[in-house]
Amino acid sequence: MTFVMKLPFVDTVVDDSLANTFVNGKKLGYEFQIRLSYYRGHYLSCIEDLTIMVDGEKVEANDINFCLNGKEFTIGQIPYLISEFWNCNEAATIKVYLPGGLEEGKHHIDVTLLLRNAYMFIPGNTEKHNYAVLDSCGSKTLTLR
């Protein structure tokens, strides 16, 4: 895999976006928003890696839903979303299933977000992929009120 660029146009983790998620009055998890830290949008199928860590603990992929354009997807669906476009000025919501949610206070969120730049073919690359990868990773401490 070839890494070409990291262009931090915006913070990946959106300020003041952390909240617990309630379903039928029960706290079933939490959510926060992320943005592409890049000047172009991407199709969701171009996401090579989306990993979330909260307070130093990795969130299992099966517990994460990715929400964009009024739709909600599992991490396993992302490689097949060839027609779902993520505009660079839109925030996506990450929903995490965690019965009881998070406690109020500060929580450190680390997002690993690597995207394949489908328009940046790397000739001669014999590794897994022949496309440059955009590093849109980010981390931030948010306060849950």
Task: Show the residue positions of the predicted features.
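Terminal leader/tail segments of proteins
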Residues: 1-145
